[in-house]
Every structure is written in structure tokens, then in C-alpha cells.
């Protein structure tokens, strides 16, 4: 003879079973969705890799053509720059402080990207003795974001541990993964401002071997100012 089970207990068991099945279905759906998202992220990474490779090949071809014709190869003007604060902790003029804040270089060895245009270059001139900057390669941008990248989410500094952090904040702009973020910064895409503001200012180390002479400009054998493509060497030494 089967054991009597009160009606209220039967209802509770039924509800629990229904809830268990619903949660199992939800986990299954979430797993399938995440699998699909990962496939999309891999596809994007492969697409960008092909795009970067084609761009590099085009430059090589143009240089080769210039040599053959006896012409000079003129590289395209840089669209994005990376600035690093190397001086100035105490007793700064209010105008200098304001500009450093605009570039998000509040602390020593902070680094940040900025769009290269007439306005930004004129502004950067006002703080040149305190910063150095130059034009990062795609590889440098990638290493900065992967090795030292943190997101600014609701005013909090969050490590970029997975793509969902990017997607939650920038998905509405079509930026759903770290590779999207790198591409947007590298190409100075239509949502560069949003992508750049999403990134917390980079915290870099003192360069291996130290600075040469922070009192003088880079072109005079010192450290501050525009070091153009050689910013990549400095970033490498500070990662």
C-alpha cells in the first residue's frame, strides 16, 4: 500500500520539480547562447586579423613600389595617439591640472589614448613638459588592453576578464568583445569616444632602465614630448 502524501506536500513537490526543470532548461539555453557568442567572437577575431594583415601587406607593397620608381613613401597620418604622464606631482598650475584631467592623466605613469586632430595636439602642447606621447601600433594597443586593460563600469575599475563586460557596456554600439574594442581604438571608429571612455586610464610601471632625462624634450635626448613611433618601445618597457 502506497504511503499517503498530503495534498499540500504533493503541490510543493510538483512546484519544486517544475522549478528544477525550468532551471535546467534555462542553463541549457544559456549554455547554447554562450557557445554561439563564443563562435561569433572567434569569427570577429579572425576577420580583424585578416583585415590587419591586408593593411600591412598594402604598406609593404606601396614601399616596394616607391623604391622601384625612385619615389618616397609617405605613410598615412596617425589617427590615434597614446600619452603617458611622466612628471608633475606637486604644485602644478591649475591650467596644467585641468588639461591633464581632460586627457585622464591624473597620476604619474598613467596612460591613455586620444584622437589625433588639431584641437587635441594644440591642447597637448600645454602639458608637454609633463607627458610624452606617440603613435601606437595595433600590436601595442592590443597588448595594453589585454595586459593592463580595466573597464570603467558605474564609476568602478573592473578588470577586463571576459567579453561580457565589454558587451554589457558597449554592445549598443556594436562593440561586443575585446577584439571589437581593440579594433575601434586602432581604427578610430565611429564610437572611439565611447570605447576610449570605457577604458580606465592605464597604470604603467616605471620603464625598465628608467627614464633618460625628464627635464628635456625627447628630440633633445630627453623624455617629454612627441616620440612618434618610438612610443611603442617605451610602452613595451613599462608593461
Curated annotation (Swiss-Prot):
<protein>
    <recommendedName>
        <fullName>Large ribosomal subunit protein uL30</fullName>
    </recommendedName>
</protein>
<dbReference type="InterPro" id="IPR012988">
    <property type="entry name" value="Ribosomal_uL30_N_euk"/>
</dbReference>
<dbReference type="GO" id="GO:0003735">
    <property type="term" value="F:structural constituent of ribosome"/>
</dbReference>
<dbReference type="Pfam" id="PF08079">
    <property type="entry name" value="Ribosomal_L30_N"/>
</dbReference>
<dbReference type="GO" id="GO:0000463">
    <property type="term" value="P:maturation of LSU-rRNA from tricistronic rRNA transcript (SSU-rRNA, 5.8S rRNA, LSU-rRNA)"/>
</dbReference>
<dbReference type="InterPro" id="IPR016082">
    <property type="entry name" value="Ribosomal_uL30_ferredoxin-like"/>
</dbReference>
<dbReference type="GO" id="GO:0003723">
    <property type="term" value="F:RNA binding"/>
</dbReference>
<dbReference type="Pfam" id="PF00327">
    <property type="entry name" value="Ribosomal_L30"/>
</dbReference>
<dbReference type="InterPro" id="IPR035808">
    <property type="entry name" value="Ribosomal_uL30_euk_arc"/>
</dbReference>
<keyword id="KW-0689">Ribosomal protein</keyword>
<feature type="region of interest" description="Disordered">
    <location>
        <begin position="1"/>
        <end position="37"/>
    </location>
</feature>
<comment type="similarity">
    <text>Belongs to the universal ribosomal protein uL30 family.</text>
</comment>
<dbReference type="GO" id="GO:0022625">
    <property type="term" value="C:cytosolic large ribosomal subunit"/>
</dbReference>
<dbReference type="InterPro" id="IPR036919">
    <property type="entry name" value="Ribo_uL30_ferredoxin-like_sf"/>
</dbReference>
<feature type="compositionally biased region" description="Basic and acidic residues">
    <location>
        <begin position="9"/>
        <end position="28"/>
    </location>
</feature>
<dbReference type="InterPro" id="IPR039699">
    <property type="entry name" value="Ribosomal_uL30"/>
</dbReference>
<keyword id="KW-0694">RNA-binding</keyword>
<keyword id="KW-0687">Ribonucleoprotein</keyword>
<dbReference type="InterPro" id="IPR005998">
    <property type="entry name" value="Ribosomal_uL30_euk"/>
</dbReference>
Amino acid at each position: 500500500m502506497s504511503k499517503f502524501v498530503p495534498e499540500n506536500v504533493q503541490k510543493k513537490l510538483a512546484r519544486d520539480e517544475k522549478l528544477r526543470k525550468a532551471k535546467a532548461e534555462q542553463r541549457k539555453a544559456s549554455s547554447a547562447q554562450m557557445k554561439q557568442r563564443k563562435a561569433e567572437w572567434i569569427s570577429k577575431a579572425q576577420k580583424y586579423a585578416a583585415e590587419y594583415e591586408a593593411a600591412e601587406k598594402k604598406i609593404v607593397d606601396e614601399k616596394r613600389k616607391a623604391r622601384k620608381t625612385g619615389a618616397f613613401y609617405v605613410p598615412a597620418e596617425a589617427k590615434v595617439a597614446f600619452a603617458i604622464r611622466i612628471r608633475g606631482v606637486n604644485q602644478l598650475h591649475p591650467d596644467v591640472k585641468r588639461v591633464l584631467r581632460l586627457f585622464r592623466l591624473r597620476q604619474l605613469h598613467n596612460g591613455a589614448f586620444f584622437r589625433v586632430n588639431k584641437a587635441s595636439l594644440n591642447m597637448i602642447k600645454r602639458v608637454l613638459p609633463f607627458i610624452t606621447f606617440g603613435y601606437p601600433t595595433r600590436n601595442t594597443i592590443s597588448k595594453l588592453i589585454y595586459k593592463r586593460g580595466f573597464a570603467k563600469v558605474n564609476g568602478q575599475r573592473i578588470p577586463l576578464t571576459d567579453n561580457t563586460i565589454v558587451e554589457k557596456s558597449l554592445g549598443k554600439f556594436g562593440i561586443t568583445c575585446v577584439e571589437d574594442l581593440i579594433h575601434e581604438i586602432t581604427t578610430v571608429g565611429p564610437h572611439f569616444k565611447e570605447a576610449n571612455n570605457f577604458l580606465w586610464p592605464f597604470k604603467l610601471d616605471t620603464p625598465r632602465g628608467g627614464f633618460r632625462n625628464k627635464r628635456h624634450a625627447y628630440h633633445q635626448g630627453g623624455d617629454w614630448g612627441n616620440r612618434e613611433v618610438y612610443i611603442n618601445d617605451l610602452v613595451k618597457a613599462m608593461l
